[in-house]
Amino acid sequence: MKLHELYPFPEERASRKRVGRGRATGWGCTSGRGNKGQNSRAGAKHRAWFEGGQMPIARRLPKRGFKNYPFKVVFQPINLDRLLASFDGKDAITLDDIYDRGLAPAGALVKILSVGEVAAAVTVEAHKFSAKAAEKITAAGGKVIALGTPEALTETPTE
């Protein structure tokens, strides 16, 4: 196949529609824009949510609820089968090992989930474990080291 054989062929492409070239064309006069108003003018753009200057619906309705975005804690989930496949035969898996293998972005909070089976005893270090994942690892003779979230690590006990 050559460049000139690619579809659509230049002669098959529809030519550009030229508007405003007389009423006989069917696209003369207002050029398909209707009569007057903001949208008939050149450069007439308005945001999809703009309501013509009246108070927008988003501002007319009251706020509701609570937004917890600044304090949201997001974990990077990793399934047991993927974790153990990446560290085949290794008896201890640290958080740095997980980051180095690219299973989670560096610095991400890691949670181990229970999809997959544990054949050999292995020590796994992560921020959080699902109950079933921890159960599977300990049942195979392994050890679970839950680091917790950074906030939990920096908290000082009060008396």
Swiss-Prot record:
The gene is rplO. Pfam families: Ribosomal_L27A (PF00828). Residues 14-44 are annotated as: Disordered. Belongs to the universal ribosomal protein uL15 family. The lineage of its organism: Bacteria, Pseudomonadati, Thermodesulfobacteriota, Desulfovibrionia, Desulfovibrionales. SUPFAM superfamilies: Ribosomal proteins L15p and L18e. Binds to the 23S rRNA. Part of the 50S ribosomal subunit. One of its GO terms (cellular component) is large ribosomal subunit. Keywords: Ribonucleoprotein, Ribosomal protein, RNA-binding, rRNA-binding. GO terms for molecular function: rRNA binding; structural constituent of ribosome. One of its GO terms (biological process) is translation. PANTHER family: 50S RIBOSOMAL PROTEIN L15 (PTHR12934), LARGE RIBOSOMAL SUBUNIT PROTEIN UL15M (PTHR12934:SF11). Residues 23-35 have a biased composition (Gly residues). Gene3D superfamilies: 3.100.10.10. This is Large ribosomal subunit protein uL15. It comes from Solidesulfovibrio magneticus (strain ATCC 700980 / DSM 13731 / RS-1) (Desulfovibrio magneticus). The keyword Cell wall biogenesis/degradation does not apply.
